[in-house]
Amino acid sequence: MNWLCTTLIVCLTLNSEMNYTNNDEFIEDVRACTVHLNSMYSEHERVPVDLVIAQSIHESEWGRSRFAVEGNNLLGIRTFDPADDQLKPLNKPNASWGLRIFETKCESISYYIELLNYNHHYDDFREERLMQYSSDLVNLEKLASTLAIYAEDVYYTQKLIQTLKELNDYK
């Protein structure tokens, strides 16, 4: 996994601790990491920064969730591999899965970008992103609507779209 080694080096040098103390700093830290990581991809492979920010807000409660604090996991990334370092949900200590532990929060963003770019579950996301890139019209709500598979919650995309709207109002 050369991309991971490269990304880890980049992430470790890019605000590895993300020492945010408020929502504005959280947004700026996630933005800085995402912009830097996106620079390693061609334009049509980049994940929109505001989508990453909105999803990290939603998944990590503004970086304050247990999984974000203890596992540097800003995006609720699960693992089913018992060999991976992971945190189990407190209400499901015997779950067959856990939330993956990352060295840095930026590494979790890198993993998320790779997931969207290469995992077959996100083909619809990539197709929609390419159509939007080709037409020069970015519609984050439409992109978010392709991410239903990301979570078990049947209302996930609606919640993500609401977070995008709140983020836009927040700015």
PLM regions and their residue ranges:
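Catalytic cores of secreted/periplasmic lytic hydrolases that degrade extracellular macromolecules
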Residues: 2-53, 58-171
